[in-house]
Amino acid sequence: MTERPFWQQKTLSEMSDDEWESLCDGCGQCCLHKLIDEDTEEIYFTNVACNQLNIKSCQCRNYEKRFEYEPDCIKLTRENLLTFNWLPATCAYRLVHEREDLPQWHPLVCGTKTEMHRERISVRHIAVRESEVVDWQDHILNKPGWAR
């Protein structure tokens, strides 16, 4: 009998730092800028990617120094996870918190990010670089719940 994977055995707070980091599928959805309506506080997703995001790989160009380059970059932690209510339904942190299993395309399950890109979970197919955008409102994704 094989042992169940760590994400099925542990809560987020029980995970090691390495286990926590490995949960991230690298989809890049966290790296897309969001706009907030000041009147309604509704969050609008854009396809505008942080300049530090390598759109092809969906990985940060300067992960270790990201806060130096992008002071507004979010740091998702065990303590603040629930404050990010915009996390997509596909987010492993959210899934594990909700006691759900990881999808078959998740790199921890299938061993590669190829399936995630093929399933169009990553932002690779929609993202544009922040430095190339003039009017962010032209880049709002008018799909409620786009971030699955």
UniProtKB/Swiss-Prot annotation:
Top-level division of the source organism's lineage: Bacteria
One Pfam family this sequence matches: CxxCxxCC
InterPro entries: Puta_zinc/iron-chelating_dom, UCP006173
Family statement drawn from the similarity comment of this UniProt entry: Belongs to the UPF0260 family.
Family matches, as NCBIfam families: PRK05170.1-1, PRK05170.1-5, PRK05170.2-5
Name of the protein: UPF0260 protein ECA2365
Organism this protein belongs to: Pectobacterium atrosepticum (strain SCRI 1043 / ATCC BAA-672) (Erwinia carotovora subsp. atroseptica)
High-level lineage: Bacteria, Pseudomonadati, Pseudomonadota, Gammaproteobacteria, Enterobacterales
